[in-house]
């Protein structure tokens, strides 16, 4: 059986996922498209899914009997509405981050999924599928001993004028918030944000770089450098210091050169190139589970925890270096 997918939101990531499903992965095809700008949906249909129908109403797409599962790739403010509609229709749903723009909205999705009695939602935290992070998690389990500290960095070449200080948390750090919690299998209990001297490349309304310090329930201390105007490349670093050793995220594969008395290796400039395989792996996981009428991978609960943690980090940006508590309710049995 070929799984029929409906894609809501055909901007850059929606079009890329449509291409991925129809041209790279097996067992599914994109059967329906929707975008607030119909021209985007028509372009996606023309370039990647000529047999797909275009829906002007996203809710009609979700309800359609010829659509088996949903991809929500639209503007973040709409995610909660469409994910809740997919749950109500009993259809597996892959939602790009954020699951919702507020912790309260993410909690409503968790509650709806609990009421449905089974997992239907996968959140697009693709780093869990990156081979480097998978190997790092294995090293933590088998080599380093219990984690003590984590040093991490998320560096972008540059950002636009519309990128503001809180976006360093909600748009950038959010990936570390999820993947570090997954690596450590530990929840956060507190967050602090420190601001070093401001980079002259940062625009007036952006404080950059930032250092976010997270503490976990087991006492692990994590420092994450967020530097979104580093200019030299897209650079993701992660080092876990354990009781018995240290494990470090490997660099992306690249040709090493020796020339002119210089040992060199290129640094990627684009996040899509850094994690291109991870997107294939995460969607393949979703399609495999959706064919069984369920969901796999990062859960709605993971999306909720990320939202609560991000809110605390944004509050910590205004707390003058003081720690802000991160408080979570008990994890529902559905996500145990």
Curated annotation (Swiss-Prot):
Assigned EC number: 1.1.1.18
GO molecular function, one term: nucleotide binding
Domain of life (superkingdom): Bacteria
Record carries keyword Secreted: no
Catalytic activity of the protein: myo-inositol + NAD(+) = scyllo-inosose + NADH + H(+)
Pfam families on file: GFO_IDH_MocA, GFO_IDH_MocA_C
Family annotation (SUPFAM superfamilies): Glyceraldehyde-3-phosphate dehydrogenase-like, C-terminal domain, NAD(P)-binding Rossmann-fold domains
GO biological process: inositol catabolic process
Broad EC category: oxidoreductase
Keywords: NAD, Oxidoreductase
Sequence similarity: Belongs to the Gfo/Idh/MocA family.
Complex and partners: Homotetramer.
PANTHER family: INOSITOL 2-DEHYDROGENASE (PTHR43593:SF1), PTHR43593
Function comment: Involved in the oxidation of myo-inositol (MI) to 2-keto-myo-inositol (2KMI or 2-inosose).
Name of the protein: Inositol 2-dehydrogenase
Organism: Paracoccus denitrificans (strain Pd 1222)
């Amino acid at each position: 059986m070929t799984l029929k997918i409906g894609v809501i939101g055909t901007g850059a990531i929606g079009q890329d996922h449509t291409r991925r499903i129809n041209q790279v992965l097996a067992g599914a095809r994109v059967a329906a498209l929707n975008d607030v700008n119909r021209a985007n949906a028509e372009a996606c249909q023309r370039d990647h899914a000529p047999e797909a129908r275009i829906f002007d109403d996203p809710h009609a797409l979700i309800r359609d009997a010829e659509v088996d599962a949903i991809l929500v790739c639209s503007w973040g403010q709409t995610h909660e509405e469409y994910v809740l509609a997919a749950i109500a229709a009993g259809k597996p749903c892959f939602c790009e981050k954020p699951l919702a723009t507020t912790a309260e909205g993410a909690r409503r999705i968790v509650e709806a999924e609990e009421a449905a009695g089974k997992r239907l939602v996968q959140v697009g935290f693709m780093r869990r599928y990156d081979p480097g992070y998978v190997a790092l998690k294995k090293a933590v389990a088998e080599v380093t001993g219990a984690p003590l500290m984590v040093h991490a960095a998320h560096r972008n070449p540059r950002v636009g004028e519309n990128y503001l200080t809180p976006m360093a948390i909600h748009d950038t750090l959010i990936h570390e918030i999820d993947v570090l919690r997954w690596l450590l299998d530990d929840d956060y209990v507190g967050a602090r944000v420190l601001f070093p001297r401001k980079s002259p490349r940062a625009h007036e309304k952006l404080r950059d770089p930032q250092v976010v310090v997270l503490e976990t329930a087991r006492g692990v201390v994590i420092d994450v450098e967020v530097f979104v105007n580093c200019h030299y490349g897209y650079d993701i670093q992660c080092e876990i210091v354990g009781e018995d050793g240290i494990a470090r995220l490997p660099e992306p594969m690249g040709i090493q050169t020796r020339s002119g008395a210089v040992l060199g290796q290129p640094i990627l400039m684009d996040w899509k190139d850094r994690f291109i395989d991870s997107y294939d792996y995460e969607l393949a996981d979703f399609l495999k589970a959706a064919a069984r009428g369920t969901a796999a991978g990062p859960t709605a609960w993971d999306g909720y925890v990320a939202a609560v943690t991000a809110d605390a980090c944004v509050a910590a940006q205004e707390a003058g270096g003081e720690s802000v508590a991160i408080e979570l309710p008990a994890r529902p049995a559905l996500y145990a």
